[in-house]
């Protein structure tokens, strides 16, 4: 019976990680769009139109967004690994419970 509770607990944890992964993927997508936007801005902003400081600010913003995308990609990989580990543990617990009930 303890395995049943553990299986339920692990399944809930796995579902929570799935939701977190989806949220993280949305953040990746949003930040990639921002990077694209800033790249386009850099194509249109020239020193003759504005000061070089504006370009430096835009480049810094772009670098910040790229760093965020990288951070979210790493976090997604970590979450995916946790989900796989939980799935493996659920499978092992289920098999052990089946053997114990035979």
Curated annotation (Swiss-Prot):
GO cellular component annotations of the record: cytosol
Superkingdom, natural source: Bacteria
Protein name, entry field: Pole-localizer protein TmaR
TM regions (residue ranges): none
Tagged with keyword Magnesium: no
Pfam families documented for this protein: DUF496
Entry-linked InterPro entries: DUF496
Principal place of residence: cytoplasm
Span of the signal peptide: none
Keywords: Coiled coil, Cytoplasm
HAMAP family: Pole_loc_TmaR
The keyword Coiled coil is annotated on this UniProt entry: yes
Assigned protein family: Belongs to the pole-localizer TmaR family.
Record's subcellular location: Cytoplasm
Species in which this protein is naturally found: Aliivibrio fischeri (strain ATCC 700601 / ES114)
Any coiled-coil regions, as ranges: 7-34
Role this protein plays: Pole-localizer protein involved in the regulation of several cellular processes.
């Amino acid at each position: 019976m303890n395995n049943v509770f553990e299986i339920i607990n692990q399944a809930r944890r796995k579902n929570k990680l799935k939701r977190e992964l989806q949220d993280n993927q949305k953040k990746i997508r949003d930040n990639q769009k921002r990077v694209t936007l800033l790249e386009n801005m850099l194509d249109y902003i020239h020193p003759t139109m504005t000061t070089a400081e504006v370009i430096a600010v835009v480049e810094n913003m772009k670098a910040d967004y790229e760093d965020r995308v990288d951070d979210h990609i790493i976090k997604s990989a970590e979450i995916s690994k946790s989900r796989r580990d939980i799935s493996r543990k659920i499978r092992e617990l289920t098999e052990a419970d089946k053997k114990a009930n035979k």
